Structure formats: structure tokens, C-alpha cells
Amino acid sequence: LGYLGTCPTNIGTGLR
């Protein structure tokens, strides 16, 4: 879901 920096623009929870 983009929590561990996997998706910076997924849900706003990624760290790129």
C-alpha cells in the first residue's frame, strides 16, 4: 500500500 517506501504517491504513506 506504500508504507515502507514502496509507493511514494500511492496513498501518501510511502517514503520513496
Curated annotation (Swiss-Prot):
Transmembrane in keyword set: no
Gene Ontology MF: a single term: taurocyamine kinase activity
Keywords: ATP-binding, Kinase, Nucleotide-binding, Transferase
Domain Phosphagen kinase C-terminal: 1-16
InterPro entries given in the database record: ATP-guanido_PTrfase_AS, ATP-guanido_PTrfase_cat, Gln_synth/guanido_kin_cat_dom
Known catalytic reactions: taurocyamine + ATP = N-phosphotaurocyamine + ADP + H(+)
Enzyme Commission code(s) on record: 2.7.3.4
Leading EC class: transferase
Coiled coil: none
PROSITE patterns, alphabetized: PHOSPHAGEN_KINASE (PS00112), PHOSPHAGEN_KINASE_C (PS51510)
Pfam families tied to this protein: ATP-gua_Ptrans
Family designation: Belongs to the ATP:guanido phosphotransferase family.
Protein name: Taurocyamine kinase
UniProt source species: Arenicola marina
Lineage of origin: Eukaryota, Metazoa, Spiralia, Lophotrochozoa, Annelida
